[in-house]
From Swiss-Prot:
Its main location: cytoplasm. Residues 147-256 are annotated as: Disordered. The keyword Electron transport does not apply. GO terms for biological process: chromatin organization; regulation of apoptotic process. This is Acidic leucine-rich nuclear phosphoprotein 32 family member E. Residues 148-205, 215-235 have a biased composition (Acidic residues). It comes from Gallus gallus. The keyword Zinc-finger does not apply. LRR repeats lie at residues 43-64, 65-87, 89-110. Keywords: Chaperone, Chromatin regulator, Cytoplasm, Leucine-rich repeat, Nucleus, Repeat. The lineage of its organism: Eukaryota, Metazoa, Chordata, Craniata, Vertebrata. It is found in: Cytoplasm; Nucleus. Belongs to the ANP32 family.
Length: 256
């Protein structure tokens, strides 16, 4: 795909001045020149044009906010002075896999005052004797060359650093919020307590009901006993009267 078409595709209906990152890797440049990029990409901070067969940076637009520029695996052999003119705030530049052969070509990067990291891996210049010391002497503003500083300490991965920062923030949030599940357990305990209270109330209601039932039954039994006693007394009275009447009846019969 041609570079101009690729740019239109990557925009995704955005205006050029709204874009901060643009990746054009593996598309085809026009005769080794940049095409489709212009000064309207003024908010661009990251631009990648790896393996697009570039031979020249002459048509690179002014990108004053650009911080990172990926130009690996192209055919660039010189003309690096344009970078300081149009991208003065570059901090990272990757020129690995290009046709850079000597220190004179790299000297043009001295005017990139904010440059901290430079990659020249797989360029012929890396075959020079004392290559690393020479580059650090020439470009004293840089900290990392081909991923390592002068003491061979590896450059940190900015994305990993951001992830670690996010993890630390998350840990702090968790610490402030308390151990996970703590509040849930408290809620469960509260719920359990309320359930227990309800159970005790139900049990008390049940006991009081049973006690009332027993008392009522006892009252009924007492009433029954009293009624039975009255009936027995009435029966005894009737029998007594009968016994009294019998002698009288006998006396009457004798008189007869």
């Amino acid at each position: 795909m041609e570079m101009k078409k690729r740019i239109n595709l990557e925009l995704r209906n955005q205006a050029p001045e709204e874009v901060t990152e643009l990746v054009l890797d593996n598309c085809k440049s026009s005769n080794g020149e940049i095409e489709g990029l212009n000064d309207s990409f003024k908010e661009l901070e990251f631009l990648s044009m790896a393996n697009v067969q570039l031979t020249s940076l002459a048509k690179l637009p002014t990108l004053s906010k650009l911080r990172k520029l990926e130009l690996s695996d192209n055919i660039i052999s010189g003309g690096l002075e344009v970078l300081a003119e149009r991208c003065p705030n570059l901090t990272y530049l990757n020129l690995s896999g290009n046709k850079i052969k000597d220190l004179g070509t790299v000297e043009a990067l001295q005017n990139l005052k904010n440059l901290k990291s430079l990659d020249l891996f797989n360029c012929e210049i890396t075959n020079l004797e004392d290559y690393r010391d020479s580059i650090f002497d020439l470009l004293q503003q840089i900290t990392y060359l081909d991923g390592f500083d002068q003491e061979d300490n590896e450059a940190p991965d900015s994305e990993d650093d951001d992830d670690e920062g996010d993890e630390d923030d998350n840990d702090e949030d968790e610490d402030e919020a308390g151990p996970p599940g703590e509040y849930e357990e408290e809620d469960d305990e509260d719920d359990g307590g309320s359930d227990l209270g309800e159970g005790e109330e139900e049990e008390e209601v049940g006991l009081s009901y049973l006690m009332k039932e027993e008392i009522q039954d006892e009252d009924d039994d007492d009433d029954y006993v009293e009624e039975g006693g009255d009936e027995e007394e009435e029966a005894e009275g009737i029998r007594g009267e009968k016994r009294k009447r019998d002698p009288e009846d006998e006396g009457e019969e004798e008189d007869d």
